[in-house]
Amino acid sequence: NVGSSKVGSASRVALFGDLHIHTGLSIDAYMNGTREGPDAAYRYAQGEPIPSPSGSTLQILKPLDFQAVTDHGGFLGMTAAMDDPNSGPGKHPLGIRLQNAKTHKERLEIYYAMYDYWDPDGVTGFTNPGPDFVNDLLDMRVVRSAWQEVIDAAERHNRPGEFTTFIGYEFTAYGPSIRNLHRNVIFQGSRVPRQPFREQDSHNPEDLWDWMDRLRAQGIEALAIPHNSNGS
């Protein structure tokens, strides 16, 4: 069971881990060259070498005790799908641009062009595409498949008493002019929702908390940890 441990309740030990990790399933990480997924992130945390975007090898000096892969819930897995010419998102104009992008600058231009698709209400202060906007760049089948990849990787790598994994993701609540506060949502065990609550569902953290309360009524426990106010 993910999140479980064999350490007794009377034991007091210092454990070291990371609850904020992005992989190629996150749009910002993908645009910056990351292609490895949750499996590689967990292997790295346990001391295994993994390839870096530059072609070198990355290896942590001391393995961690616990970790959660917390990819962005918004557009989870969509960037890799856009980069695939055989997928639906890969046939979108921005997908075609991404496939043909040769430089980091070009990828960043596509990244900013996608703000309208993250935020069709224009809360962030970027261009408001209007009330008739159709988000043809968001395929929830892709999002749910990526979410399942996150779940499966956590379950595969969990070794109670040796290395503990948590299923989680990042929720970003936008405010005017991109004033935001990021929250890592960490689930207690293996019972998790079918898909994460994302900024496309609501920009209000109160709505996130209400969603978590509804999950709790179903026996699904989660904790939202604020971690970053960048852009605020």
Regions found by a protein language model. Give the residues of each.
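Extended, charged catalytic domains and RNA/DNA-binding interfaces, predominantly
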Residues: 1-232
